[in-house]
C-alpha cells in the first residue's frame, strides 16, 4: 500500500501532464499506458517522518525500536526507487534528515538520471503530510539546491498520511515524457 500510494500521490500530476502530451501527439490509450508504465521506474522519492509511532503501529518497526528511536530523536529517511520502499538512512533530527534527502536527490540527478537531466526531462516534486508551513520551508531549501528547476508541491493523501503520520516531508524526481 505505502509504495503505490505514496508514489502515485507524488507523481499523479506529472503523469496526467505526460498523458496529455502523449494524447496531443496522437498516441492512443494503449500507447499512453505503455509509455507511462515504462517511465514510472525513472523516479526517486526520499521521505522523512516526524514520528515513529505509525511505523510501529503498522508493524514496520518493533515497539522497542520505536521507543529507542524516539528517545534519540531518530528520523528515518525512506526511499522509493521504482517499485521498492526501503530504509535509506537514520538521522538525528529533522534538519539532518532534510540534508540527507537533498544530498541523495542531488546524487540521483547527477548520476542515475544524468542523461535525462541533460535533456531537460526530469522534474522535481515536494510532498508533505499536515504541516504546510514546514513543507513550504523545505520547498525553499530544495530550490536553493536545485536552482532554476520547477518544484511542484502537494500534500500526500490521507490514505498515505495514516501510515506515516503528520509532519512527514518528501522530495522526489520523475522523468517527464518528451515526444519526438
Specify the residue positions occupied by each region the protein language model found.
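Mixed-charge interfacial surface used for oligomerization/domain docking
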Residues: 9-180
Amino acid at each position: 500500500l505505502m509504495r503505490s500510494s505514496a508514489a502515485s500521490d507524488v507523481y499523479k500530476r506529472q503523469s496526467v501532464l505526460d498523458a496529455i502530451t502523449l494524447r496531443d501527439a496522437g498516441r492512443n490509450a494503449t500507447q499512453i499506458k505503455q509509455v507511462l508504465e515504462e517511465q514510472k521506474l525513472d523516479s526517486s522519492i526520499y521521505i522523512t517522518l516526524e514520528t515513529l509511532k505509525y511505523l510501529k503501529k503498522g508493524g514496520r518497526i518493533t515497539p522497542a525500536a520505536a521507543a529507542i528511536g524516539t528517545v534519540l530523536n531518530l528520523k528515518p529517511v525512506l526511499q522509493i526507487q521504482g517499485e521498492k520502499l526501503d530504509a535509506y538512512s537514520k538521522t538525528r533530527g529533522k534538519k539532518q534528515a532534510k540534508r540527507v534527502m537533498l544530498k541523495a536527490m542531488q546524487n540521483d540527478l547527477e548520476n542515475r538520471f544524468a542523461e535525462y537531466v541533460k535533456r531537460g526531462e526530469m522534474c522535481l516534486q515536494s510532498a508533505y503530510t499536515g504541516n504546510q508551513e514546514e513543507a513550504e520551508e523545505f520547498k525553499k531549501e530544495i530550490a536553493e539546491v536545485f536552482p532554476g528547476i520547477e518544484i511542484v508541491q502537494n500534500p500526500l493523501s490521507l490514505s498515505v498520511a495514516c501510515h506515516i503520520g503528520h509532519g512527514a516531508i518528501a522530495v522526489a524526481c520523475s522523468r517527464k515524457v518528451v515526444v519526438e
